[in-house]
């Protein structure tokens, strides 16, 4: 069996070792059998001379919540940046809503219904909260406008209180809320969060996860990377574990959370 392949079954899939007897690929119950929103096959990517991704296969269904796990340096952020077009894949295929997206620019991929909140937030410090939000507002890929400025401000009361403040006047947690709110105003089909809670105060972290849960409940698919694996697994349907740029385990998040041997082996916890 190739390192990134899983066979059909009820549990998780591990390519070897203590968990190697489990087989299967989790599918969100409500969307089992639905055409994938995103499908990547055989993705390879490099940074300079370094070969980072080695034949990654990943699919995400409509409304599915997926947690991307692995130790630091295993390729999680590179995979996300490759999916968004910021890193050019050296080989493989990428389809978003059935459209070939491998050669598209990041803005073109975003127009297909993907929204990305990177590490570092990327807000505009000289624009107000209102301006930061409104510059991103648009209808979704199917024309819907479920997430409006009013809905984002209701979800993030702190932003409503600072609506006229410049981005540079916000705390780190408020800037992260602004970045997520701006992404939601694109009315995405898939929201990708890369280390959304890193370095934030615990009460802000709780607020971020509350919003992640609300986004999931609204039917938007999510792909989440975060160092707090317990929170990731508690807010997702399925886990995908990377090691050295390869998928080494995929299965239900609840299975991963209950498997201490798996967590020790691949996350070092």
Region locations from a protein language model:
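ABC-type ATPase nucleotide-binding domains, specifically the catalytic core motifs of the NBD
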Residues: 48, 66, 104, 129-147, ...
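The feature captures the beta-strand-to-loop junction immediately N-terminal to the Walker
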Residues: 69-71
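Helix-to-loop junction immediately C-terminal to a conserved catalytic motif
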Residues: 84
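Conserved ABC transporter NBD signature motif
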Residues: 6, 23, 92-100, 112, ...
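ABC ATPase C-loop
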Residues: 183-184
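Conserved ABC ATPase signature
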Residues: 166-170, 174
